[in-house]
Amino acid sequence: MIPGEVQVAAGDIELNSGRETVSATVANHGDRPVQVGSHYHFFEVNEALVFDRAPTLGFRLDIPAGTAVRFEPGQARTVQLVAYAGKREVYGFQGKVMGALEGRA
């Protein structure tokens, strides 16, 4: 082994395996494009994006880290979302949660 070398297992790594997912149909009713990053709490995205928000509480886009989805004005699309893991606490974003996700409806 070379110092600093990384040895990985053979095969593909499945992202977000075993996590709860939901899909949401989202329409951009604004006059500007809206881009949402991979780890943004989808419940709190720009208000120009119109969709049923309640089921998205505690979910983010199910896409690779560091990537984003762009919604053009007038565009509607269905996206796949994946549940946050770990402590399941959300802070920041638009400040709509600021704490634990459990026990919220």
Curated annotation (Swiss-Prot):
| Segments traversing the membrane | none
Claim: Amino-acid biosynthesis is one of the keywords in the record: no
The keyword Amino-acid biosynthesis belongs to this UniProt entry's keyword annotation: no
Q: In which pathway does it act?
A: Nitrogen metabolism; urea degradation; CO(2) and NH(3) from urea (urease route): step 1/1
Where does this chain mainly localize? cytoplasm
Q: Which UniProt keywords apply?
A: Cytoplasm, Hydrolase
- NCBIfam families to which the protein is assigned, alphabetical: PRK13203.1, urease_beta
- Indicate the quaternary assembly: Heterotrimer of UreA (gamma), UreB (beta) and UreC (alpha) subunits. Three heterotrimers associate to form the active enzyme.
Its name, as the record gives it, is Urease subunit beta
